[in-house]
Amino acid sequence: MMHADEKIWIGFGDIHEDISRVNEIPELSDAEGVIISGDITNRGGIRKASQLLEVIYRLNPSIYAQIGNMDRAEITTYLDEKGWNIHATGKQLAEDIGIMGVGYSTPTPFRTPSEVPDSMLAQWLNKGYAQIKHLPKLILVAHDPPFGSKAADLPFGENVGNRSVLEFIQRIQPDICLTGHIHEAASEEFIGKTKVVNPGMLCMGGYVRIRLKDSKLDAKLMFI
């Protein structure tokens, strides 16, 4: 239930071509916008991504999205044309809130379509931040989770997080980091003052409720 004095955004990711549960998310249609952290498709291009995103658009036309490592790079062109892209880009989300994203991922054992060196992610993070650093509140959307975080824990103990994302969070301390990539690591925790939330795969029912109320920005891991 939303109140008149608050604003809500809904975040999720790792769609992997399964949006069967998206209309089960409470408040999705009434939210200020939808934030998508990456992996819209399974090695798909613009045609597949547009089919999926048009369904979400019909529920809520205010979309902020980026590709993950499982999406072909051409999808960024489509997102740019629609005005939805946040990868390597900073945008004003509300009066005093900036949002920025970094998609893709560092190399995986699976040779997925959109993998880059860690140094490239660092460049993209700096590029996006430069566009919105004047705003006092910040949401970082990072497909690759920060190194050492619960959001990057594999089931058997290995942590596969990203060092550039961690360094950026430690240095800038955004209010919220919406992340994904590691499906088994649905979690929420703080790194300094930054709330880091990985909702896992959308088809498993995880999403993030981001709320602005009384000038305070917070995020909560939710399940359908």
Residue ranges and their predicted role:
Residues 28-29, 54-60, 94, 132-134, ...:
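Short, conserved loop/helix-junction motifs that constitute active-site signature segments
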Residues 10-13, 34-39, 63-69, 85-87, ...:
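Active-site neighborhood of phospho(di)ester-bond hydrolases with catalytic His/Asp-centered motifs
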Residues 25, 51-55, 124, 161-168, ...:
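A general structural detector for well-ordered alpha-helical segments in enzyme core domains, enriched
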Residues 21-24, 40-57, 72-87, 111, ...:
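Metal-dependent catalytic neighborhoods of phosphoester/phosphodiester hydrolases
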Residues 2-10, 91-101, 133-138, 190-196, ...:
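Beta-strand-turn-beta hairpins that frame and shape the catalytic cleft
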Residues 17, 71-164, 223:
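Conserved catalytic scaffold of divalent metal-dependent phosphoesterases
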Residues 153-214:
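Conserved beta-sheet core of the metallophosphoesterase superfamily
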Residues 1-58, 134:
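N-terminal active-site segment of His-dependent metallophosphoesterases
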